[in-house]
């Protein structure tokens, strides 16, 4: 038997045809969103505040410290924020201390940092009442990158390098003309690489060669004509960065040091340090080279690796364990560019063994010359306080050194030399066995944990670059996922916070520098975080990564939360992105879906995470693999799972899913299809180190829901995955007969269903709420009577007793969503799928929502399909449908539209707008469905033009006198002073009023300035499927309904069953999506057997299984049958493929698009008709359409279209009058666009004449209307 029955949740069961004997559950599909936001709340904010703490005044008198932070609970619930159109936020407060440095006094207060939008449990944010999703961004990781391009002229490869931080100045290496190597700092002009090396602290060519070793490539770097040293090189480097500006060497050194080695200006982040240490590790380059000298343990003189030995992986492992012996000091602390110079250091260690610092010189009062602190005085807290009290009289150097942000003892501890790991190797061996090409390899200090770049890193990167010319080291593939990482919501928010806090920091510094401690009540008077609030608000409302949630169905919702975009701030520009960055890369395997991406300009730049993908702490995407063990000559699959990044995967040989195992989990085949370093091949089973966990780990959730995916062309699979996300929720959802097994998890994790938070019994259920009573963890009594004893088994009877006695602490209440409007104007309705007394486990699905059935994804309906033509109506992929599907609401959907009206306070003296039933100049019939306030009654049926809310606006701005007011009240002559500004149903709309929301300033509702009342009317419309609606299958087979036939005209089977849908058979072979044919055969068999089937992607029903199930269902082996013409009753000549296909109705509906105009608005300048359905516009008659009329010689029609039907203002009014009066149509006048053209020429200073042929007059400035002729005075 090639299948097994599997239960999905409690309600759904399928016959699963998966061949894999192991089944790894999918991880929570939206956990990356929730986990990242939680990290930001717990750690991200804390790290940021530490980076900005303390903020010090310019004179050093006052400091502001951020001690801690806390969030207040949100003011409104999620439901309330949606109704009131406000954001779901919590106030973020920071505990702030203002310190008087001179006296040590402090003042504390809690200050509002910002209103922080909170993530809901489903991974969304609610901003201004609408749900939004922040998608993850994929960017190039901070690291050191090298690239090589073959130069045809030079007949060799030229290399370039980039040292890229997360934030800060880039260092770039490149080869210029005449084979000279150059360096650039911070995108400045380039300088010779030799000068850049000098600037790092080397004083002579000999010093450089002593570190880097002698080599031909290094010799070519030096400019032999000039004498260069460290100081001159620093000044030159500064000059290149600052566009030729010349400064003293101390200023240049200080500037370069700040640019590269200051944490505030240069940030690698954790990921940058990890990647730097990985790339610049000397041992990575040394593998497969020959050691140039003995590797000796200096402690016992033991030779650990002999000279000339090949450095294999085993030898490299020995070096790794003893890598501290490779460290050499390049610069001591005194000459390290990262440290202050001798002139800047004003304290020294008198006794090396003691941690005590003494002043180098006398510290004097710069105003009076008085000695404040004598030379050789021990620096302690008293001395520092004494200097603080005299801060205004100190020299700038003194105050910077002793009273800077860093403690001087900490500075001394941090002042270290530059250490690098150095190894000399031979790279080549000739035929005689002689080694040659000696190369010096320099790696960075692997102990380094600093978040900024170090001199050790820079030296190692230069050496790596030079090594490339000696064939040591590797170039990087920037499109490899080992070099690209995800910025999740937590990191994106942290970056925005940094921008906001940086702007706020300057403002705070200015405030505290102009304030005195005694004059302020607390830090709240000095601190203003308006900049931060503005940045956060802008990010959530305007950023390309913060998107309006695609709420049309659960799959669309889930896919958007797992979406990965390369666009946005710090990402790729869509217009400049090449093919390489868009293309599928072998490192995407199991991490990014190679199928699901948009068609059009964003192709390849927006992708989706694969089903099992996770993101590690550095932002690199991981995918799981089973460990493979080699034991007793057998290759065994372990159940231990490792999550590997693309970099970690490089070294492994990974078996592709589909391998055959025996009962002991050992591989049966000697040769296994596997991947190594991205390439697929056949390997011996004893070489395998890992194995895929599932065949579907390659693709995304949307793609894995396509059955028989392996039989479809990739471009059609892409369309299938994308179109499923456009499926409209149907009135009666139905899960697919032929599924893939992911439908349950996709629906559960999407966020549109209610999941039980704990186990228990259902003690109350209706359409509004579900109550689950859970098992108490202690004995429960009431009035001496025991309601539940922990020794007893917990039953429904006991749960009911607890519920009836109102024990709320043991009850969990779940509120269902009823008739809500989604972001895409579709209906959101949740219905209970549990019954009273049912036992529920934690994690069970309690309700079915839009496009779900029994807890499974249900985007469409299972319909009987025949691949045949019918009178040419299914030409070009058109679809012919049965009228029965329309009658029985098979593809009917409900849509809800929102209409809004506000009453405003008008200008002074003009009064205010009013909501009223007394609408002027309308009959009683127009207001029959309005209540006494003038608002439509819910449940009323409305059509276009009907009044929804009666509103009147005063005309004129004259305030009536008291006597006039009295007359108006007595006579009631409102109609004369008020105009009708009621909210009406727009053109082409209508339906049933579902609900009305009324907000008023009087009721305490928060409304925009000047608005007194706000009324929202929701109209529900039932849309039956219609000709012109777009439908699709799951295989990219899309089409538009061309004809809906009555049941009696449709072809029928031998048993009289009519066909539901007819598809064009020509749409299959050229599109190469054969999956749809297999689906209809399997669907027909499963329907006859009364079962549902799961055929997982790459691991489902094969030819043998399909034949067996068709035999079981008594169907023909080829799936074809004789059909009879419904009109004549005669059989068709050929047997026809008939089966059951799952087809969805897409959101491209004809009701939204069909539109016609007779009269309507015109654009102001050109006076041509507006365009589009929203503006009630006309159809564009473009250049090519004009050519068509040329071709027919239809001169009068053409003239009419280009004049009176377009922008001839006078002509169209005269034509209208002529049609009404029945007179002859007049000649057209000059079109308005021609007048606009003339005005544009005149605006350029050109003299334009328009000479009338009969009168010879210049009519260029003549008025549009002949007043005399028209009868005007």
From Swiss-Prot:
Q: Which superkingdom heads the taxonomic lineage of this protein's source?
A: Bacteria
Q: Which GO terms describe its molecular function?
A: DNA binding; DNA-directed RNA polymerase activity; ribonucleoside binding
Annotated GO biological processes are:
DNA-templated transcription
Q: Which UniProt keywords apply?
A: DNA-directed RNA polymerase, Nucleotidyltransferase, Transcription, Transferase
Q: Which family does the record assign?
A: Belongs to the RNA polymerase beta chain family.
* Record's keyword annotation contains Transcription: yes
Quick one: a GO cellular component term?
DNA-directed RNA polymerase complex
Q: What is this protein called?
A: DNA-directed RNA polymerase subunit beta
> Where does the record locate the signal sequence feature?
none
Q: What reaction does this catalyse?
A: RNA(n) + a ribonucleoside 5'-triphosphate = RNA(n+1) + diphosphate
Q: Which Pfam families match?
A: RNA_pol_Rpb2_1, RNA_pol_Rpb2_2, RNA_pol_Rpb2_3, RNA_pol_Rpb2_45, RNA_pol_Rpb2_6, RNA_pol_Rpb2_7
Q: What is its EC number?
A: 2.7.7.6
Quaternary data: The RNAP catalytic core consists of 2 alpha, 1 beta, 1 beta' and 1 omega subunit. When a sigma factor is associated with the core the holoenzyme is formed, which can initiate transcription.
What is the protein's known function? DNA-dependent RNA polymerase catalyzes the transcription of DNA into RNA using the four ribonucleoside triphosphates as substrates.
Q: Which InterPro entries match?
A: DNA-dir_RNA_pol_bsu_ext_1_sf, DNA-dir_RNA_pol_bsu_external_1, DNA-dir_RNA_pol_su2, DNA-dir_RNAP_su2_dom, DNA-dir_RNAP_su2_hyb_sf, RNA_pol_bsu_bac, RNA_pol_bsu_CS, RNA_pol_bsu_protrusion
The gene name reads: rpoB
């Amino acid at each position: 038997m090639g299948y097994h029955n599997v239960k999905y949740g409690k309600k759904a069961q399928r016959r699963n045809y998966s061949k894999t004997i192991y089944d790894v559950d999918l991880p929570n599909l939206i956990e990356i969103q929730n986990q990242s936001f939680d990290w930001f709340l717990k750690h991200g904010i804390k790290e940021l505040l530490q980076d900005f703490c303390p903020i010090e005044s310019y004179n050093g008198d006052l400091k502001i410290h951020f001690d801690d932070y806390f969030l207040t609970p949100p003011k409104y619930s999620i439901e309330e924020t949606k109704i009131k159109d406000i954001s779901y936020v919590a106030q973020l407060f920071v505990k702030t201390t203002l310190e008087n440095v001179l006296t040590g006094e402090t003042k504390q207060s809690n200050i509002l940092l910002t209103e922080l939008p909170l993530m809901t449990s489903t991974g969304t944010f609610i901003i201004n009442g609408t749900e939004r999703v922040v998608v993850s961004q994929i960017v190039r990781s901070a690291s050191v990158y090298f690239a090589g391009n073959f130069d045809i002229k030079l007949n060799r490869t030229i290399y370039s390098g980039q040292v890229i931080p997360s934030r800060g100045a880039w260092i770039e290496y490149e080869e210029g003309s005449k084979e000279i190597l150059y360096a650039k700092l911070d995108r400045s002009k380039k300088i010779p690489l030799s000068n850049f090396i000098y600037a790092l602290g080397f004083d002579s060519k000999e010093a450089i060669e002593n570190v880097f070793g002698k080599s031909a490539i290094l010799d070519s770097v030096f400019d032999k004509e000039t004498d260069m040293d460290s100081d001159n090189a620093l000044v030159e480097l500064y000059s290149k960065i600052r566009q030729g500006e010349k400064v003293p060497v101390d200023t240049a050194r200080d500037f370069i040091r700040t640019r590269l080695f200051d944490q505030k200006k240069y940030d690698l982040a954790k990921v940058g340090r990890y990647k730097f240490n990985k790339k610049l590790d000397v041992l990575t380059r040394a593998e497969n080279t020959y050691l140039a000298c003995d590797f000796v343990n200096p402690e016992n003189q033991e030779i650990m690796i002999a000279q000339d030995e090949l450095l294999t992986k085993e030898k490299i492992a020995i070096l790794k364990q003893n890598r501290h012996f490779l460290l050499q000091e390049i610069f001591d602390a005194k000459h390290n560019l990262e440290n202050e110079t001798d002139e800047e250091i004003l304290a020294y260690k008198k006794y090396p063994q003691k941690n005590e610092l003494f002043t180098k010189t006398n510290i004097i009062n710069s105003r009076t010359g008085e000695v404040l602190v004598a030379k050789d005085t021990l620096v302690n807290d008293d001395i520092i306080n004494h200097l603080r009290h005299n801060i205004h009289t100190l020299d700038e150097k003194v105050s910077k050194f002793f009273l800077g942000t860093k403690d001087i003892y900490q500075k001394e501890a941090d002042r270290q030399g530059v250490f690098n790991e150095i190894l000399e190797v031979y790279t080549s061996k000739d035929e005689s066995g002689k080694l040659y090409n000696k190369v010096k390899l320099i790696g960075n200090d692997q102990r380094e944990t600093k978040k900024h770049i170090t001199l050790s890193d820079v030296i190692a990167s230069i050496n790596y670059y030079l090594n490339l010319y000696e064939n040591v080291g590797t170039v990087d593939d920037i499109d490899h996922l080992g070099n690209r990482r995800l910025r999740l919501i937590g990191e994106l928010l942290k970056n925005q916070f940094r921008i906001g806090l940086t702007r706020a920091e300057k403002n705070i510094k200015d405030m505290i520098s102009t304030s005195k401690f005694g004059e302020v009540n607390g830090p709240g008077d000095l601190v203003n975080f308006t900049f931060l609030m503005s940045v956060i608000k802008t990010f959530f409302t305007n950023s390309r990564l913060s998107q309006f949630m695609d709420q049309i169905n659960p799959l669309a919702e889930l896919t958007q939360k797992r979406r990965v975009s390369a666009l946005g701030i710090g990402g790729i520009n869509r217009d400049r992105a090449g093919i390489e960055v868009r293309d599928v890369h072998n490192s995407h395997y199991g991490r990014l879906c190679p199928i699901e991406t948009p068609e059009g300009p964003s192709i390849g730049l927006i992708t989706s995470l694969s089903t099992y993908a996770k993101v590690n702490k550095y932002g690199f995407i991981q995918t799981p693999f089973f460990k493979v063990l080699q034991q007793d000559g057998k290759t065994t699959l372990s159940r231990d799972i490792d999550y590997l990044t693309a970099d970690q995967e490089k070294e492994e040989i990974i078996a592709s899913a589909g391998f055959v195992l025996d009962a002991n989990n050992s591989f049966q085949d000697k040769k296994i299809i596997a991947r190594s370093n991205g390439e697929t091949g056949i390997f011996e089973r004893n070489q395998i180190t890992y194995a895929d966990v599932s065949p579907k780990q390659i693709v995304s959730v949307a793609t894995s829901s396509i059955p028989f995916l392996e039989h479809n062309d990739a471009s059609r699979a892409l369309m299938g995955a994308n179109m499923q996300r456009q499926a409209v929720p149907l009135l009666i959802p139905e899960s697919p007969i032929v599924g893939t097994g992911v439908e349950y998890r996709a629906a559960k994790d999407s966020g549109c269903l209610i999941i039980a938070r704990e186990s228990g019994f259902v003690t109350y259920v209706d359409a509004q709420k579900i109550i689950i009573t859970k098992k108490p963890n202690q004995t429960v009594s009431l009035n001496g009577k025991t309601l539940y004893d922990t020794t007893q088994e917990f039953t429904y009877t006991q749960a009911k007793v607890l519920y009836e006695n109102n024990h709320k602490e043991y009850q969990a209440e779940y509120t269902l969503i009823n008739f809500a409007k989604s972001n895409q104007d579709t209906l959101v309705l949740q219905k209970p799928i549990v019954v009273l007394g049912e036992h529920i486990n934690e994690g069970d699905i309690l309700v079915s929502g839009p496009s779900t059935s029994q807890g499974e994804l249900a985007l469409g309906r299972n319909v009987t399909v025949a691949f045949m033509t019918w009178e040419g109506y299914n030409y070009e992929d058109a679809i012919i449908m049965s009228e029965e599907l329309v009658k029985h609401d098979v593809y009917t959907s409900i849509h809800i539209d929102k209409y809004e009206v506000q009453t405003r306070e008008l200008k002074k003296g003009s009064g205010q707008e009013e909501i009223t039933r007394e609408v002027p100049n309308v009959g009683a019939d127009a207001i029959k469905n309005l209540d006494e306030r003038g608002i439509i009654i819910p449940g009323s049926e409305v059509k276009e033009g009907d009044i929804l809310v009666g509103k009147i606006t005063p005309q004129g701005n004259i305030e009536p006198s008291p006597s006039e007011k009295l007359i108006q009240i007595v006579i009631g002559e409102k109609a004369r002073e008020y105009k009708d500004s009621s909210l009406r149903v727009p053109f082409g709309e209508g339906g049933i009023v579902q609900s009305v929301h009324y907000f008023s300033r009087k009721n305490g509702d928060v409304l925009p300035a000047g608005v007194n009342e706000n009324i929202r009317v929701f109209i529900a419309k039932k849309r039956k499927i219609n000709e012109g609606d777009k439908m699709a299958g799951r295989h990219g087979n899309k089409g538009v309904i061309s004809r809906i036939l009555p049941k009696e005209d449709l072809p029928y089977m031998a048993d009289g069953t009519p066909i539901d849908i007819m598809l064009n058979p020509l749409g299959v072979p050229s599109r190469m999506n054969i999956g749809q044919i297999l689906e209809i055969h399997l669907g027909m068999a499963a329907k006859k057997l009364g079962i549902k089937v799961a055929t997982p992607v790459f691991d489902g029903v094969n030819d043998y299984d399909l034949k067996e199930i068709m035999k079981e269902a008594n169907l023909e082996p080829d799936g074809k049958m004789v059909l009879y013409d419904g009109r004549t009753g005669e059989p068709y000549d050929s047997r026809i493929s008939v089966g059951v296909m799952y087809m969805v109705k897409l959101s491209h509906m004809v009701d939204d698009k069909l539109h016609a105009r007779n009269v309507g608005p015109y654009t102001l300048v050109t006076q041509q008709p507006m365009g589009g359905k929203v503006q009630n516009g006309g159809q564009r008659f473009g250049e090519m359409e004009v050519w068509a009329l040329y071709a027919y010689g239809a001169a009068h029609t053409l003239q009419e279209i280009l004049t009176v039907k377009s922008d001839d203002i006078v002509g169209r009014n005269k034509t209208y009058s002529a049609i009404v009066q029945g007179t002859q149509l007049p000649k057209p006048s000059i079109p308005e666009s021609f007048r606009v053209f003339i005005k544009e020429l005149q605006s350029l200073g050109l003299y334009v004449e328009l000479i009338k042929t009969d009168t010879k007059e210049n009519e260029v400035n003549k008025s549009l209307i002949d007043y005399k002729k028209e009868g005007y005075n």
